[in-house]
């Protein structure tokens, strides 16, 4: 059975909806007067970059201000103390022949490699620790010498001039390093082998032939 809607009910529903709509659209205050919208002012916040009067000092910068050199100048690398230390290393003493430089580097490596092999080798708790450690250090010297020779063959061609720069970073002329040639690198590799084996023999002689009292067995 269909139900008919009375006119009174429709008027009540329409008046209720209109009153709700008016309440949502125009809210009223406590005094039943409609609230007025207070005009607001839009504030804009602007940030401006101000250039400093003096340029900031960069701690790390390219050497001589040239980024194409491919090296950076830092407070450590540009320190006179660090420069003095590096210039006194055997590999950077260009006034010394490559053969003597290789002997000096090899002596240091051979002498100091014996101790770790003796104390940390597989035969460290046996009576053969000294001999086994010395032979292992000598074997490592041979391997390093072969690697140095392979690097020289792959990097330098026989008869070509030195690949080292003939100018310093400040533009001063200098004699090219003879180590950066095929002949110079061959002498350095031979000197490293001779010095390394000599260092191993000298360390074994001091530890087990002279039996120095300060050596802790």
Curated annotation (Swiss-Prot):
First and last residues of the transit peptide: 1-48
Kindly give the membrane topology term recorded for this protein: Multi-pass membrane protein
What UniProt keywords apply to this chain's record, in alphabetical order?
Chloroplast, Membrane, Photosynthesis, Photosystem I, Plastid, Thylakoid, Transit peptide, Transmembrane, Transmembrane helix
The domain of life is Eukaryota
One Gene Ontology cellular component annotation held by this UniProt entry: chloroplast thylakoid membrane
Q: Which residues lie on this side of the membrane: Stromal?
A: 49-135, 211-217
Residues in the Lumenal compartment per record: 157-189
Subcellular location(s) of the protein: Plastid, Chloroplast thylakoid membrane
Do you know which Gene3D superfamilies this protein is assigned to?
Photosystem I PsaL, reaction centre subunit XI
Predominantly, its location class is plastid
Concerning InterPro entries, the annotation shows: PSI_PsaL, PSI_PsaL_sf, PSI_suXI
* Assigned protein family: Belongs to the PsaL family.
Q: What is this protein called?
A: Photosystem I reaction center subunit XI, chloroplastic
Organism whose genome encodes this protein: Cucumis sativus
Name the lineage. Eukaryota, Viridiplantae, Streptophyta, Embryophyta, Tracheophyta
